[in-house]
Amino acid sequence: MAIDENKQKALAAALGQIEKQFGKGSIMRLGEDRTMDVETISTGSLSLDIALGAGGLPMGRIVEIYGPESSGKTTLTLQVIAAAQREGKTCAFIDAEHALDPVYARKLGVDIDNLLCSQPDTGEQALEICDALARSGAVDVIVVDSVAALTPKAEIEGEIGDSHMGLAARMMSQAMRKLAGNLKQSNTLLIFINQIRMKIGVMFGNPETTTGGNALKFYASVRLDIRRIGAVKEGDNVVGSETRVKVVKNKIAAPFKQAEFQILYGEGINFYGELVDLGVKEKLIEKAGAWYSYNGDKIGQGKANAITWLKENPAAAKEIEKKVRELLLNNQDAKPDFVVDGNDAEETEQDF
């Protein structure tokens, strides 16, 4: 429908005034001069990248990863950092829990010599550091471990047993308002790790909630619920964890999908194991009995030997990964693979 000529002139004058006052690009039509595709960073897990629908975690956004203790939250974020560093990106780790192990981080592929690390004294200090790094425009990925450890200054200066009702929630709410715009402008990915708490007296529905108030739930573009669902064994020895991640919230693609993968102790996410499984599922790798073949050539008897072959032949592994991503990311159904039930999906209130 054609717009009235006088209205067009008035709109052009208004747009000109806005750009003059606030700078070029402060207002534009949605389809012009901007990329429609969201830039992403791999999570280190092929199945999780596919479940997210965009091939990884989105740049310029806030992401929340939460789950029980020892479920793989920090491991997953370290894998994201390793993937970002391989692309030449600068990363920072805000270690509010004071528990980052540099030896373990190096084993997961993190370049610790070029990883910025801060162990702040208070929650306000941690969030100010995040804001300063985002505003610099020089840092691509920031990880905060964890929201539960972001202690307000008033609580640290007070005594144990003092009541500080809603302080952490108020601090997080103010930080979200300030950070969201700066992150978008600098195209910085900010990942918050969070812990789970139980609400008392919940008879029906999910009693679980996350710390730090409700603001983070609203501002996060992606929320991931990570759980340990079993053990990976070699004989009688436990060598890793079977892990399930649910995409509880997703603003860049269809939500409520899930991914399952292995986290091996001292190695991280079993990427090549996922590659074999997805390759077989998509008929890129042929499986006959115990033998695995690729392009007509046998690559190993048993999954372990197939994984070893892929590790020794990175070019073939890269080729299979590219084909899997093209098949599964470009042809995603509108219907999610997995829908969490109402109890899991509901946004619950925060206990202070």
From Swiss-Prot:
Q: Where in the cell is it found?
A: Cytoplasm
Gene Ontology BP term (one): DNA repair
**A Pfam family for this UniProt protein?**
RecA
What the entry lists under Gene3D superfamilies is as follows: P-loop containing nucleotide triphosphate hydrolases (3.40.50.300)
Question: Which keywords does the record carry?
Answer: ATP-binding, Cytoplasm, DNA damage, DNA recombination, DNA repair, DNA-binding, Nucleotide-binding, SOS response
Which CDD domains does this UniProt record tie to the protein?
RecA
Write one Gene Ontology MF term. Answer: ATP binding
State the GO CC annotations.
cytosol
The answer, when asked if Aminoacyl-tRNA synthetase is one of the entry's keywords, is no
SMART domains recorded for this chain? AAA (SM00382)
Residues binding ATP are 67-74
Disulfide bond annotation, renumbered to this chain: none
Q: What does this protein do?
A: Can catalyze the hydrolysis of ATP in the presence of single-stranded DNA, the ATP-dependent uptake of single-stranded DNA by duplex DNA, and the ATP-dependent hybridization of homologous single-stranded DNAs. It interacts with LexA causing its activation and leading to its autocatalytic cleavage.
Which PANTHER family does the protein's record reference?
Answer: MITOCHONDRIAL DNA REPAIR PROTEIN RECA HOMOLOG-RELATED (PTHR45900:SF1), RECA (PTHR45900)
Q: Which family does it belong to?
A: Belongs to the RecA family.
NCBIfam families under this entry? tigrfam_recA (TIGR02012)
Record's protein name: Protein RecA
- Species of origin reads Klebsiella pneumoniae subsp. pneumoniae (strain ATCC 700721 / MGH 78578)
Gene that encodes the chain: recA
